[in-house]
Regions:
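Periplasm-facing N-terminal accessory domains of Gram-negative outer-membrane beta-barrel systems
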Residues: 19-106, 439
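Transmembrane beta-barrel wall of Gram-negative outer-membrane proteins
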Residues: 24, 243-270, 279-313, 321-345, ...
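N-terminal secretion/transport leader regions
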Residues: 26, 30, 38-46, 72-76, ...
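Periplasmic N-terminal accessory/gating domains of Gram-negative outer-membrane beta-barrel systems
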Residues: 108-115, 119-212, 223, 229
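Short strand-turn segments of transmembrane beta-barrel domains in outer membranes
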Residues: 192-195, 203-214, 222-253, 261-285, ...
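Extracellular loop and loop/strand-boundary signature of outer-membrane beta-barrel proteins
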Residues: 235-237, 274-280, 314-320, 328-332, ...
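Outer-membrane beta-barrel translocator domains and adjoining extracellular loop/strand segments
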Residues: 275-280, 307-310, 314-322, 355-363, ...
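Signature of Gram-negative outer-membrane beta-barrel scaffolds
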Residues: 394-477
Length: 477
């Protein structure tokens, strides 16, 4: 451990020495119409040929020598903004980008995309915009995020009628799927034909297929990171749509103009409503709700409360019913310690429920997983050549393997509860993104995590502590 600390010290020492003679420009980049912060906006200093990108909350920071510079900010679907700025001291500068109304001509993708990827140490990462997803062919007129990422290289379908995906040979349960930092355990609606993500409420999608940053843990194949919209803090808007399978409605607007906002987006299928008009008592439907509240306390502090709730229900003749779905909530606090140090504190709750009712036998069965997660992440812009990402994470797991209860007094089922399992998973990480020369950049990091089983458990032992032996003649122990 001391050896690693020494290596890190000598690698970062030049950055600290040279950064003393420089100043920093930092700020937030947002949409002019809605004040929605924009993720992944390119901020480029033309005179120095250096630049950076906004983080998950629209924040950027660049350290550079004193002088006059032309700052270019660009983002797909928005007009590029160019502004000349004199920088003689640390400056906070926010930018607002206007959505581009110009109709784009046919775009031909060339090898330049690979050249751009080589320039960044972040490899095997794909980013999709919501507009791109909505332009793709849709099943029964329903846009689908999971189906869209199947078009990316290295991503395949988990199977017919399933909404999961495999990345480079990994299993579907080896993918970490996050919605506003909260874990989504089941991404499917309606037997896998649709995913649980309402694209009307989504702001940013990023898929890590390799070189996964050390701030993520718990999975080995990939990370699908999804962020919801914050809501329009300027004006009230509503939009929706009616499809063959489901309908949707979104409402967003200011709580306090230019300071706080809300967003509510709901979807529901309605095929089961028509089945009630016939003698058919079968039913299959889903619904979900996305919510988000955002509030700007001051220039250095922001609060976010986001949530998702979804359910799928399938029943046959009122004698069989299957119910499952996700529930997640996240309370976040963004704090800017300085123009170089950004932090985010998150309190996260994730829940997956699975229920089964068999009235002809007379029992209810339910199981599920609950997580309580505390995260504290920091992003430190040490210099124009070095960025540090570090933080801690603590997860409390509550596993319910199964609980069975009789549905009526004539049922022959006795109530029973399989022993619940509990665990605690703390972790800490550090990531370094460093530009060594104009042609060489590296990204390296380390993550430390532990998994603790909690609570009592019944352990069976053999009489007299005799060792277990195997009899090959009778194939018994």
């Amino acid at each position: 451990m001391m050896f690693l600390k020494k290596i890190l010290f000598f690698l970062l020492l030049p950055s600290f020495v040279f950064s003393q003679e420089k100043v920093t420009i930092s700020g937030i980049i947002s949409d002019t119409n809605s004040n929605e912060t924009l993720i992944g906006v390119s901020v480029y200093v033309a005179e120095l040929n250096i630049g950076t990108y906004t983080n998950e909350y629209g924040f950027y920071s660049i350290t550079l020598p004193k002088g006059n510079y032309t700052i270019l900010t660009s983002y797909i679907g928005f007009e590029t903004l160019s502004e000349k700025i004199e920088i003689n001291q640390n400056v906070k500068k926010n930018f607002s980008l206007k959505e581009s109304k110009q109709e784009l001509k046919e775009v031909v993708i060339t090898s330049n995309i690979y050249k751009n990827n080589v320039k960044k140490p972040e490899m095997s990462v794909n980013k999709l915009s919501v507009n791109t997803i909505k332009q793709m062919p849709a099943i029964l007129g329903e846009t689908d995020l999971i189906k869209s990422i199947l078009t990316l290289p290295g991503v395949t379908n988990a199977g017919e009628g399933q909404s999961g995906f495999n990345v480079r040979g990994g299993a579907a349960d080896q993918n970490l799927v996050l919605l506003d930092e909260a874990t989504i355990y089941n991404t499917s609606h309606l037997f896998g034909f649709f995913s649980v993500f309402n694209t009307d409420a989504i702001k940013d999608i990023k898929l890590y297929k390799g070189g996964i940053p050390s701030r993520f843990g718990g999975r080995v194949a990939s990370v699908l990171e999804i962020y919801q919209k914050d809501g329009n803090s300027s004006d009230f808007h509503m939009n929706g749509g009616i499809g063959i399978i489901s309908s949707r409605l979104l409402a967003e607007g200011p709580i306090i103009k230019n300071k706080g906002s809300f967003l509510f987006a709901g979807r529901s299928s309605y095929a089961h409503l028509f089945l009630k008009l016939t003698d058919n008592k079968n039913s299959a439907y889903f619904y979900d709700l996305n919510t988000k509240l955002s509030y700007k306390l001051n220039e250095n502090n922001n609060l976010y409360l986001s949530g998702y709730f979804g359910r799928d229900v399938f029943s046959l003749n009122e004698s069989f019913m299957n119910t499952y779905g996700n529930s997640v909530f996240n309370l976040r606090w963004n704090h800017l310690f300085s123009d170089k140090l950004f932090s985010n504190l998150s309190l996260i709750y994730s829940d997956y429920y699975y229920g089964l009712t068999l009235d002809f036998i007379g029992f209810n069965w339910d199981s599920g997983i609950k997580n309580y997660n505390l995260k504290y992440d920091f992003k430190h812009y040490v210099s124009d050549k070095t960025k540090l990402y570090y933080g801690v994470n603590a997860i409390y797991h509550d596993f319910n393997p199964g609980k069975i209860e009789p549905t009526n007094s004539s049922s022959g089922i006795n109530p029973d509860q399989l022993a619940k399992k509990y665990a605690f998973e703390p972790s800490a990480y550090i990531d370094v993104e460093q530009q060594i020369t104009d042609k060489l950049s590296i990204n390296y990091g380390i993550r430390y995590s532990k998994f603790y089983r909690l609570g009592n458990e019944e352990i069976n032992i053999y009489a007299n502590n005799q060792a277990v032996t195997y009899n090959p003649d009778f194939d018994i122990y």
